[in-house]
Regions:
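A glycine-centered beta->alpha junction motif in the catalytic cores
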Residues: 1-7, 16, 48-53, 113-114, ...
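Conserved kinase catalytic-core helix
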Residues: 1-56, 67-73, 77-82, 88, ...
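Preference for well-ordered, secondary-structure-rich cores of eukaryotic proteins
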Residues: 5, 34, 38, 66, ...
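Phosphate/pyrophosphate-binding loops and the adjoining catalytic core of nucleotide-dependent enzymes
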Residues: 14-30, 41, 45-47, 139-146, ...
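Regulatory N- and C-terminal appendages and interdomain linkers associated
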Residues: 61-65, 103-106, 181-225
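Active-site acidic catalytic loop and adjacent metal/ATP-binding pocket
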Residues: 69-122
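Active-site activation/catalytic loop segments of kinase-like enzymes and analogous catalytic loops
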Residues: 106, 114-175, 191-205
Length: 225
């Protein structure tokens, strides 16, 4: 059972035991392959899958732009050069972390083998994966609690975040500040992650993820203006 105290303990354990920092040259190109190139590839996969589908213009009553609009607004040079290179999990979210209260030990499962071919990767990605898993509880999705409806050019999604998600987001943000990491990058990676996940899943989760990416992009850029 997740508690604020256990979440603090998890991040502290990850920082000392999991995320072993290491300097590498040319990490910007690796990040560009992982963030920019992969996103373009996944977007193309989605559009092949739904060649006749029109993206929603409103999501949950919020006006949103096209995915192309948001991808063009991203400062990819900043995103790919502002990195914290470390040994990372690659799919760092609650489903893949087991806690044993008897031994007070964490165990990670379902590791990703590489980050665009590199055995190390961008720590920001693990943090964004965790944030994305707080805002969208994958256990709830597997339990068939997800709801997606589209009508004309609008989409409606139900909230599938974890319980007390706002509090855990605040905790994660505080840990990022302690680690001197840029919270804006963590936030921006979340809709990129959702977008990249979208073509890999069946309906309606695929369109839910796509529309959720639009919604989070809209919130991010509206606050940035």
């Amino acid at each position: 059972q997740l508690t604020p105290q256990l979440f603090d303990k998890l991040i502290a354990w990850s920082n000392t035991t999991l995320w072993k920092r290491k300097w590498f040259p040319n990490t910007e190109q690796t990040s560009r392959d992982f963030y920019f190139k992969k996103t373009q590839d996944r977007l193309n996969q989605f559009r092949v899958k739904y060649s006749d589908w029109s993206e929603p213009c409103t999501v949950n009553g919020t006006a949103v732009q096209s995915i192309d609009y948001y991808l063009n607004k991203i400062d990819w040079d900043w995103l790919c050069s502002t990195t914290e290179w470390a040994f990372i999990h690659g799919d760092y979210q609650f489903e893949n972390i087991i806690y044993n209260p008897d031994t007070d030990q964490f165990t990670c499962i379902d590791w990703r083998t590489d980050f665009a071919g590199d055995s190390y990767g961008d720590l920001y990605y693990d943090l964004a994966k965790m944030l994305g898993g707080i805002l969208l509880d994958y256990q709830a999705v597997k339990a068939d609690k997800l709801e997606y409806h589209e009508h004309a050019d609008s989409a409606t999604l139900n909230d599938c975040g974890i319980d007390d998600g706002v509090d855990y987001v605040s905790q994660l943000r505080a840990h990022c500040a302690k680690l001197s990491l840029d919270w804006n990058k963590v936030r921006l990676l979340v809709p990129i992650i959702y977008l990249n996940m979208s073509p890999l899943h069946d309906a309606p989760f695929d369109k839910y993820l796509f529309a959720l990416a639009q919604l989070h992009f809209a919130r991010f850029f509206d606050e940035a203006n």
